[in-house]
Swiss-Prot record:
Its cofactor is Mn(2+). Residues 1-19 form a transit peptide. This is Intermediate cleaving peptidase 55, mitochondrial. One of its GO terms (molecular function) is metalloaminopeptidase activity. GO terms for cellular component: mitochondrion; nucleus. Keywords: Aminopeptidase, Hydrolase, Manganese, Metal-binding, Metalloprotease, Mitochondrion, Nucleus, Protease, Transit peptide. SUPFAM superfamilies: Creatinase/aminopeptidase, Creatinase/prolidase N-terminal domain. The gene is ICP55. Disruption phenotype: No visible phenotype. Altered mitochondrial protein stability. InterPro entries: Aminopep_P_N, Creatin/AminoP/Spt16_N, Creatinase/aminopeptidase-like, Pept_M24, Pept_M24_MAP, X-Pro_dipept-like. It comes from Arabidopsis thaliana (Mouse-ear cress). Mn(2+) 2 binds at D296, D307, E433. The keyword Metal-binding applies.
Amino acid sequence: MQFLARNLVRRVSRTQVVSRNAYSTQTVRDIGQPTPASHPHLMAEGEVTPGIRIEEYIGRRKKLVELLPENSLAIISSAPVKMMTDVVPYTFRQDADYLYLTGCQQPGGVAVLSDERGLCMFMPESTPKDIAWEGEVAGVDAASEVFKADQAYPISKLPEILSDMIRHSSKVFHNVQSASQRYTNLDDFQNSASLGKVKTLSSLTHELRLIKSPAELKLMRESASIACQGLLKTMLHSKGFPDEGILSAQVEYECRVRGAQRMAFNPVVGGGSNASVIHYSRNDQRIKDGDLVLMDMGCELHGYVSDLTRTWPPCGKFSSVQEELYDLILQTNKECIKQCKPGTTIRQLNTYSTELLCDGLMKMGILKSRRLYHQLNPTSIGHYLGMDVHDSSAVGYDRPLQPGFVITIEPGVYIPSSFDCPERFQGIGIRIEDDVLITETGYEVLTGSMPKEIKHIETLLNNHCHDNSARTSPVSLCKVKGLHTNRNPRRLF
Ligand code: GLY
Ligand code: MN
């Protein structure tokens, strides 16, 4: 989609004309997010977001309309902007349902979908002051021309138009997580709610998002591959720099230079007993010689996330106690992955992993009773994965897996320092997590390139040439023997 040069400038006043285009080339309109014209290195013609074409977005909307009862509306708001302080926002992340259905990566809009009207988008109206502070954003023109909305209005028209749509609908589905007062405060919405006509949309959208299309799988594979490369580089680096904060910074750097827009979540980098805190996030401690470090990380690539965990000894050698416990988690990881196939459920995988882990922990004398198992592992063996890290959370774990589902397999054990067990096991936390695509015949491990065998990890850590200057400048990693930079802006390594 090419925008004309006439759109390049925006009148600030009668006498003053200021161009605020972040990507001004005199021929390309800035709509506040990449387009094939503004970012040809990222996007091919016909794509609305990198890797996903307009036909796919239209197909998703058609499927959602088919799932809606007759004469129903679906209202999906973009995610709210969260402020760090005063006028300074946190990095914006779009609501996954809104992104899935519209392709719009920006805040301030509300999308409404119905059989009668198709996609109707209410878009933000920027003032010159907004543009001066935040740059150009997608408005009504972009809604029609880029996102291919059937109808597009400025957001100020929402109360009048949406009220009328709600009044004429028998049911209103909406995205509760990102619900906006722009519509929940409308009298007609509140009347519908009081009559029991307002329903949750996520049960429908999460259903659609469970099965990934070929284009989505390409992005999921790429996201997983970036996570594997980033974690491997960080693992190698850990021998010279056993520090949670440095490793957290490095894994983010390694993912972002490979094209990821952000991490899928704040990485968990727990050294020693910090690894027994499941979602440890402080990442502020040195890792003691001989301790393990657990790193749970993932990145987001054009809306699709990865989720990967490895646990290793930065010193390069597992102790015999660490090896014994690690082997139990590794065997459980591998056995559960082997069970992944159409028809199996996450619940069944969880039951299987609980049996394996309980048996092992009892045999090692760590558990005195199977009843205590949940004190050492309160987590599920896995979850669905996609646009969100705990994706399609409205779908339960009793759903038979189908080709195109992506799930995680993440057995772990988290032994608090105070747990009543032989002292040598106290304060150890181990998790090994992979991303698994369900195929017609079984599975494909998307994170299979990241080593997890003890001998492979030890070999890698002990045959790696370190560059000490990397402590102050991660870029100098490219000077490490055997690594080469290339100048492709999407892929630096
Ligand atoms: N890796 C984060 C989680 O699964 O909760
Ligand atoms: Mn996970």
